[in-house]
Amino acid sequence: MNLLDPILLESKPLLFLSFLTAIVSAVHRHGSLLRASIASSGNDHRLGGNEAPPAIISVYLGEGLEKLLEAVENQREYTYIAESMRDLQIPTLPHLLLDTLDRNRTSPFVFTGNKFEFRSVGASAHPGKAVTVLNAIVANL
């Protein structure tokens, strides 16, 4: 079972929201540790320069999940829709599925459908240190 699959919102919404908010909270509280886990001279030069993502660790959830969390915070009703359809008003063409993901890659920590991507690890670096730190900061909550 993927605990970060938004399909859980239908059957087990508290389970999904618990894991999602735990990860977001951990990155918010311990972003500096996560940033230190990917630090190297080459990566520090790359991040925030002429290339995305920036050196500041931020989380991008997408518009749908952002609205859902705001509704939970404000105790309002909200129905999460994972994807949207666009009708081009051309009878011979099907409806298009709109992508709500971060395509321009401007955030270093992104929710992409049913998982998080940490995009700040350098190409030549081993992701093990960052994954270990991420697991530790989430477990620390």
Name the predicted role of every residue range.
Residues 1-141:
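Active-site capping/gating regions of soluble enzymes
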